[in-house]
Amino acid sequence: EEDVEQAISMIRKAQKPFIFVGGGAVISNASEELRAFAKKIQAPVADSLMGKGAYDGTDELYTGMVGMHGTKTSNFGITEADLLIVVGARFSDRVTGNASKFAKNAKILQIDIDRAEINKNIHVDARIIGDAKVILRKLNARLDPINHDEWIAHIERMKDMYPLRYDKSVLTGPFIIQTINEMTKGDAVIVTEVGQHQMWAAQYYEYRYPRSLLTSGGLGTMGYGLGAAIGAKMGCKDKTVINIAGDGCFRMNMNEIAT
């Protein structure tokens, strides 16, 4: 309870809060509470690869992924923030880059169920250990709505200045992913293998729901996608399931077609 009080004090004092969401928010089924929290404190939201879908990728507060494969808005936003609220993310090197320069202007509040993740890769100023869904519900109950209109307007300007770009004169991976997004209206289950196509799938598809992206983001296991897609279709028979694969990954486990 003392940690919750400290977090509330930090949130109330912040002028430029930013929320960073990882796979822990998906595991804890915290999407509803996360959305309410972001709206209440009027903070932009970015995610990691494994956090995709925890927050609606079409929402106005969403800024995209963080890190080496992230958007400029997310990365610049975190650099400018005075408070970074991290929900269920482990600060991998793909996210932080040079750890000594990550979120250098911000106090960091980490929410995680695993005590071992606290201060492991990045030093934090405060932490709350527990289930993200439960903790966010507590914070929502204790906080009044906070206005950060100027901060959000600044983030919107960055979105306009730094959109994701690709060459539209030729057939490219980003164009294909974006077309799939338009055709499925963001309502499919996307499965990926590992490689550049995996990053395109994370960047150019708008994930609106948790568990709508199935990908091997920790160990990065090539050959994961085909079997995972078959399993996803068996579990979600009413959903369109699309496996996005490179030739090398596909050949590793193409024997799954025999299933």
For each feature predicted by the language model, list its residue ranges.
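Short glycine-rich anion-binding loops that position phosphate/pyrophosphate groups of nucleotides
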Residues: 23-26, 51, 89-92, 195-197
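Glycine-rich, acidic loop regions that bind phosphate or pyrophosphate groups
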Residues: 51-154
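Active-site diphosphate/adenylate-binding microenvironment
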Residues: 154-233
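Glycine-rich phosphate/diphosphate-binding loops and the adjacent beta-loop-alpha structural elements
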Residues: 15-28, 163
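Conformationally flexible catalytic loops at phosphate/diphosphate-handling active centers
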Residues: 1-13
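Thiamine diphosphate
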Residues: 73-75, 80-83, 88-92, 199-259
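Glycine-rich phosphate/diphosphate-binding loop of Rossmann-like nucleotide-binding domains
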Residues: 26-32, 36-39
